[in-house]
């Protein structure tokens, strides 16, 4: 964010972007907010930025940390079905980014989480040298037949990665 309603973007794949033009003049940027940005590139190497772009739309993305899954809290995270296309998951900017298809709620906000399964590893009795992550979704039994895409970016930078790869 530069100041006021003026902002720049640090893109996962495109580097730094300067919104030289926009189709969304009333967008209010929030410093540090991850967004999915639809844009058209205008210029390369523009005044210290990698690209100048025309922003067509910004979608704010939910950001979270990896949470620990245990026997005590497993029901809190739920295990309801949600559709994730493998082509709609990527790593960038220190985040695992996931776009998923969900049945929308009637009134209760759903919970989406990426959890580290410490319970399963402890139950097996030995550490296999891997971090076990699960994408969990809790509808709280509040769904409609109406579907929509959702997006979440989960920071993994606080995880201690195994040395065995």
Model-derived regions, located:
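Conserved small/polar residues in nucleotide/adenosyl-binding loops
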Residues: 157-163
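Surface-exposed beta-loop interaction hotspot
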Residues: 45-96, 101
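Structural detector for short beta-strands of small beta-barrel domains
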Residues: 1-3
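An anionic, turn-rich surface loop/hairpin at beta-sheet edges
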Residues: 128-154
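Short helix-loop boundary/capping segments
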Residues: 84-138
